[in-house]
């Protein structure tokens, strides 16, 4: 079941790739993918290329995939291990969601962080109190790690 669904998503991605994103299996292992997200233009991540790993559980799509950044990023909802705080990867997961939709949600999280549900409270505090400083540091990290 999982493998069939993963193959279908791979075909859908090839036919209709989401804007600014790409994803596909690493080698022959269909349960382990690598994804790429281009830093959105209207964000301090503009110009960056961010890599993520995707691990599908054997009971996919009934359980969410594990998605994590491998490129370092300065963001209140993404910690230094690359873990992403995003409701659809946890409690709000639904089998109707696809990797394409997950990647688009991560893209929109880059444009619009959620400082009220942070993984990194210190970055959330800076985002809320000094947006200029947040944008500057996020741009610096993007230049340092994602270009």
Swiss-Prot record:
Signal peptide from the UniProt entry: none
Documented effect of changing residue 93 to A: Abolishes histone H3 ubiquitination and decreases interaction with PHF7
Effect of residue 144 to E: Abolishes histone H3 ubiquitination
Any GO CC annotation of this UniProt entry: extracellular exosome
Catalytic activity: S-ubiquitinyl-[E1 ubiquitin-activating enzyme]-L-cysteine + [E2 ubiquitin-conjugating enzyme]-L-cysteine = [E1 ubiquitin-activating enzyme]-L-cysteine + S-ubiquitinyl-[E2 ubiquitin-conjugating enzyme]-L-cysteine; S-ubiquitinyl-[E1 ubiquitin-activating enzyme]-L-cysteine + [acceptor protein]-L-lysine = [E1 ubiquitin-activating enzyme]-L-cysteine + N(6)-monoubiquitinyl-[acceptor protein]-L-lysine
GO biological process annotation, one example: protein K48-linked ubiquitination
Effect of residue 63 to A/E: Strongly reduced interaction with CNTO4
Enzyme class: transferase
Molecular function terms from GO: ATP binding; ubiquitin conjugating enzyme activity; ubiquitin protein ligase activity; ubiquitin-protein transferase activity
EC numbers: 2.3.2.23, 2.3.2.24
Taxonomic superkingdom: Eukaryota
Catalytic residues (positions): 85
PROSITE patterns: UBC_1 (PS00183), UBC_2 (PS50127)
Annotated pathway: Protein modification; protein ubiquitination
Domain UBC core: 1-147
Keyword line: ATP-binding, Nucleotide-binding, Transferase, Ubl conjugation pathway
InterPro entries xrefs: UBQ-conjugat_E2_core, UBQ-conjugating_AS, UBQ-conjugating_enzyme/RWD
Family (UniProt): Belongs to the ubiquitin-conjugating enzyme family.
Function field: Accepts ubiquitin from the E1 complex and catalyzes its covalent attachment to other proteins. Catalyzes 'Lys-48'-linked polyubiquitination. Mediates the selective degradation of short-lived and abnormal proteins. Functions in the E6/E6-AP-induced ubiquitination of p53/TP53. Mediates ubiquitination of PEX5 and SQSTM1 and autoubiquitination of STUB1 and TRAF6.
Self-association state and partner proteins as the record states: Interacts with SCF (SKP1-CUL1-F-box protein) E3 ubiquitin ligase complex. Interacts with CNOT4 (via RING domain). Interacts with E3 ubiquitin-protein ligases CBLC, PJA1 and PJA2. Interacts with PDZRN3. Interacts with PPP1R11. Interacts with E3 ubiquitin-protein ligase PHF7; the interaction inhibits cleavage of PHF7 and promotes association of the complex with the nucleosome core particle.
Protein name: Ubiquitin-conjugating enzyme E2 D2
Lineage: Eukaryota, Metazoa, Chordata, Craniata, Vertebrata
């Amino acid at each position: 079941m999982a493998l069939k669904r993963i193959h279908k998503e791979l075909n859908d991605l090839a036919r209709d790739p989401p804007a600014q994103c790409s994803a596909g299996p690493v080698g022959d292992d269909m349960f382990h993918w690598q994804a790429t997200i281009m830093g959105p233009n209207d964000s301090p991540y503009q110009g960056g290329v961010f890599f993520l790993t995707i691990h599908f559980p054997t009971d996919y799509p009934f359980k969410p995939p594990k998605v994590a950044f491998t490129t370092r990023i300065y963001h209140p909802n993404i910690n230094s291990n690359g873990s992403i705080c995003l409701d659809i990867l946890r409690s709000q997961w639904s089998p109707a969601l696809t990797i394409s939709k997950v990647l688009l949600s991560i893209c929109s999280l880059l444009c619009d962080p959620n400082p009220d549900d942070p993984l990194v409270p210190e970055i959330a505090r800076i985002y809320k109190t000094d947006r200029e400083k947040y944008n500057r540091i996020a741009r610096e990290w993007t230049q340092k790690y994602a270009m």
